[in-house]
From Swiss-Prot:
Similarity comment: Belongs to the D-glutamate cyclase family.
Keyword annotations of the record: Lyase
InterPro entries (alphabetical): D-Glu_cyclase, Putative_hydro-lyase, UPF0317
Disulfide bond annotation, renumbered to this chain: none
Pfam families: D-Glu_cyclase
GO molecular function: lyase activity
The organism of origin for this protein: Afipia carboxidovorans (strain ATCC 49405 / DSM 1227 / KCTC 32145 / OM5) (Oligotropha carboxidovorans)
Record's protein name: Putative hydro-lyase OCAR_7359/OCA5_c07590
EC number: 4.2.1.-
Residue ranges the record marks as coiled coil: none
NCBIfam families documented for this protein: PRK05463.1
Keyword Transferase: no
SUPFAM superfamilies (UniProt xref): PSTPO5379-like (SSF160920)
Length: 271
């Protein structure tokens, strides 16, 4: 299920959200969205039939660290007015992954031909928001300079089940000097709607993670000399829950290819 890493276009880094979505919708941009539309919230996406939506909502409510719900759509409605007045979820994500009966079947760049009147969209906060806050504080994130994203891993940490939905906690890893790790914990704790504080610091083996084995080969596994790995809950956890629950049909964003919204990152800070 590993997807090739798409080309990143740094010329869009200062684009506003509308320009980014238009580039995705009309110009066929299919790359990672990290660094695009600085200052604005990006969202993980999961789209399910309405018959599965209530159990999935309960799963999100029971697991707010990996599933910090920003909004859900009305049934059959491709808009998300809480995030922007001009989002069309069928076209505005760079890459989508489609699952049937829990199995990944294809990756596409447009889901208009897959859209149904019974679908409900869930949008979750994304760690790209707190990454901006870390950078604003002077904490370096090397992977961004290399046009990459944080490493993604399947841990052995559990989530709380809801109906058919359960999953191991998917995590992202960023490495820091001890001093910067302390500051990163303080900063990200201010952003519970984009995964909040870390779930683990230090030895990856304690949470069942091998840094050489990334989920879908996504992200940078590097831990620099004198640095320690720090792990955050990841918005790909719902994708794993879907794979275990095996609904007949589901659509998610592809890893690190998010929905760019009109919400300000600063609006999600709690203090």
């Amino acid at each position: 299920m590993s997807a090739p890493r798409p080309v990143y276009d740094p010329s869009w880094d200062r684009a506003n959200p509308n320009e980014v979505r238009r580039s995705i919708r009309e110009r066929g941009y299919t790359g990672y969205t990290a660094g695009l539309a600085p200052g604005f919230v990006q969202a993980n996406i999961c789209i399910l039939p309405k018959d599965w939506a209530e159990d999935f909502l309960l799963f999100c409510q029971r697991n707010p660290k990996p599933c910090p719900l920003l909004t859900r759509s009305d049934v059959g409605d491709p808009s998300l007015p809480a995030l922007s007045d001009n989002i069309d979820i069928r076209t505005d994500v760079p890459r989508y992954q489609i699952f049937r009966n829990g199995e990944f079947t294809e990756e596409v760049t447009d889901i208009r031909s897959h859209w149904r009147d019974d679908l409900v969209t869930f949008a979750f906060g994304c760690s790209f928001s707190f990454e901006e806050a870390l950078q604003d504080d002077g904490i370096p994130l090397r992977f961004l300079a290399n046009n990459n994203v944080a490493g993604v891993y399947v841990s052995t940490m559990p989530t709380e089940a809801a109906g058919p939905f359960e999953a191991p906690l998917i995590v992202t890893m960023r490495s820091f000097t001890p001093q910067n790790a302390i500051r990163a914990i303080q900063i990200t704790s201010r952003f519970p709607n984009v995964h909040g504080a870390p779930v683990h610091i230090g030895d990856p083996a304690q949470i069942g993670v091998d840094l050489a084995k990334r989920y879908q080969n996504v992200g940078d596994p590097t831990v620099g000399e004198g640095e320690i790995p720090v792990f955050w809950a990841c918005g790909l956890t719902p994708q794993f829950a879907v794979m275990k629950a095996k609904p007949p049909f589901c659509i998610t964003h592809a890893p690190s290819s998010m929905l760019v919204t009109d919400l300000r990152n600063s609006s999600l800070a709690v203090m």
